[in-house]
């Protein structure tokens, strides 16, 4: 529980500072290089790390919601950049990541992100979108890029 409480502070401080989304590419703020790009034609994502920071937090946290236009699916990635190991961890809540030791921490972080964007109270996000994060009984939802950009524009 102590670790989780620390992570709340990290989310609140970092989410607005680091996220910037343009088209289907996630850019780190104040950096011209793409952190994550998405190819509509093949429904594939490509990750490149171009961000360096000065604080001692282990993770930089990015939220990327993309609509897979050719695949007709909605998808949400919560992207963790582990600056200690210089690796990117793509966390997909419906995937097989639950064997990871950091599973509970990541679920908790997703809950906090959903709380920040007030997602659980907006019925619009439930239409044709895989919605419920069943782990830990949270009602966070998945959203497409268009809706996410509207939310982020309001915040940023």
Swiss-Prot record:
It comes from Invertebrate iridescent virus 6 (IIV-6). It comes from the Viruses. This is Uncharacterized protein 082L.
